[in-house]
Amino acid sequence: QHSTDYDEVEDDRAKLHLDAR
């Protein structure tokens, strides 16, 4: 499992994207 800030940011963005929808 990769635990990097970039991965976390990407996940956050994906969640925001779904929320924005």
UniProtKB/Swiss-Prot annotation:
Chain residue ranges for the region called Disordered: 1-21
Basic and acidic residues composition bias: residue spans: 12-21
Pyrrolidone carboxylic acid PTM positions: 1
Entry PTM: Conversion of fibrinogen to fibrin is triggered by thrombin, which cleaves fibrinopeptides A and B from alpha and beta chains, and thus exposes the N-terminal polymerization sites responsible for the formation of the soft clot.
GO terms for cellular component: extracellular region
Subcellular location: Secreted
Presence of the UniProt keyword Hydrolase in the record: no
Biased composition (Acidic residues): 1-11
Record function comment: Cleaved by the protease thrombin to yield monomers which, together with fibrinogen alpha (FGA) and fibrinogen gamma (FGG), polymerize to form an insoluble fibrin matrix. Fibrin has a major function in hemostasis as one of the primary components of blood clots. In addition, functions during the early stages of wound repair to stabilize the lesion and guide cell migration during re-epithelialization. Was originally thought to be essential for platelet aggregation, based on in vitro studies using anticoagulated blood.
Protein name: Fibrinogen beta chain
UniProt gene name: FGB
